[in-house]
A protein has these predicted regions:
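Hydrophobic alpha-helical scaffolding
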Residues: 9-16, 51, 73-76, 107
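Active-site proximal loops enriched in glycine and acidic residues that flank catalytic Cys/His/Asp
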Residues: 65, 101-106
Length: 152
C-alpha cells in the first residue's frame, strides 16, 4: 500500500493500481461525484468488480471458476497478473531475489494463485514443485530443488 489502501495489487474490493484518469472516466460514465468514485474504487472494485459482483472472497471465486464461471476465472487471472507484476518490479528494484514467500490467506492457501503467479516468473528461473504446492497452510518450500529462486 501507498498513501491509500488503493495502491498495490488487486484486492477483494479495491482496484489496486489504476490509471489516474480513470477517476474522471468513471465519474462521467456513472454520473458520480468524487466520493462516489472513491466508493466504487474502494468497495465495488477488485475481485468483486472483476467477477461481476459475484464475490470478493477468493474461495467463492475459485469454486465458481472451477465450475466454469468465466468472470470468476478472469478475476483470478487479473489478481495473479497483478501480483506477478509487483513481484517483477521489486525483483528489478532489488537486482534479483533469493526467495519469494507467499503469505496471508490467499498466499498460504490458494494453490492455483501460487502456481499462476510463479508461471509468470519463469524468466527468473523459478520452478514450482507441484506436489509441494499442493499443501495449504504449511511453512514449506514449494519450489523445485533446482529452482534459481526459492519459493515458500
Amino acid at each position: 500500500m501507498g498513501l491509500t489502501p488503493l495502491e498495490g495489487v488487486v484486492m477483494g474490493t479495491r482496484s489496486g493500481n489504476i490509471d489516474p484518469a480513470i477517476m474522471e472516466f468513471i465519474a462521467k460514465k456513472e454520473n458520480l461525484d468524487i466520493e462516489g468514485v472513491m466508493n466504487v474504487l474502494n468497495k465495488k472494485s477488485g475481485l468483486l468488480g472483476l467477477s461481476g459482483g459475484l464475490s470478493s472472497d477468493f474461495r467463492d471465486l475459485n469454486e465458481a471458476a472451477e465450475g466454469g464461471n468465466e468472470d470468476a476465472a478472469n478475476a483470478i487471472d487479473v489478481l495473479c497478473y497483478s501480483i506477478a507484476k509487483f513481484v517483477g518490479g521489486y525483483v528489478a528494484a532489488m537486482n534479483g531475489v533469493d526467495a519469494i514467500v507467499f503469505t496471508a490467506g490467499i498466499g498460504e492457501n490458494a494453490i492455483p494463485v501460487r502456481e499462476k503467479v510463479v508461471s509468470y516468473l519463469g524468466y527468473l528461473g523459478v520452478t514450482l514443485d507441484k506436489d509441494a504446492n499442493g499443501h495449504r497452510g504449511e511453512e514449506i518450500v514449494i519450489s523445485t530443488p533446482d529452482s534459481k529462486v526459492k519459493v515458500a
